[in-house]
């Protein structure tokens, strides 16, 4: 398992965050490992996460990006969640490669600099805005890049 390759502190933080999965709407470990592998296998350098929450997925993305020499830009609307995430990024040794943005994701994505390029985008936020997020991310996506959206099947009615 990938988690066993992480330092003890990161393993402990991730296991604690897994206990709050429903409260903070975190992805499953299986999904986290899948995203980790996509980043490492594709040698992604620029990843954007929409929906930071408490940082669970961001830690996984950050650990993968440490292997590829990349950076993560993560966006969260709620102040308290982003503050918790920042603490978790520090504890897990990924804060140095993560840029956090606080605010409305659609607005932040809409006004990304024209030359901002994305290898992989992971969207796990307000389901009713997924199509809008996609439209703002697509012009920045590098050839061969990926956009992964969580809950598109389980929350299909909200995504449309």
Regions found by a protein language model. Give the residues of each.
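A short alpha-helical cap/connector motif
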Residues: 1-122, 127-148, 152-160
């Amino acid at each position: 398992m990938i988690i066993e390759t992480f330092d003890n502190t990161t393993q402990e933080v991730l296991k604690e965050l897994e206990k709050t999965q429903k409260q903070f709407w975190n992805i499953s470990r299986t999904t986290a490992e899948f995203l980790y592998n996509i980043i490492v296998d594709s040698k992604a350098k620029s990843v954007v996460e929409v929906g930071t929450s408490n940082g669970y997925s961001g830690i996984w993305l950050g650990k993968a990006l440490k292997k590829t020499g990349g950076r993560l830009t993560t966006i969260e609307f709620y102040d308290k969640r982003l503050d918790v995430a920042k603490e978790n990024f520090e504890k897990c040794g990924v804060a140095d490669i993560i840029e956090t943005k606080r605010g409305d994701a659609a607005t932040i994505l809409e006004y990304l600099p024209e030359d901002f390029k994305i290898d992989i985008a992971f969207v796990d936020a307000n389901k009713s805005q997924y199509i809008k997020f996609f439209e703002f991310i697509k012009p920045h996506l590098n050839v061969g890049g990926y956009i992964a959206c969580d809950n598109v099947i389980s929350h299909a009615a909200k995504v449309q």
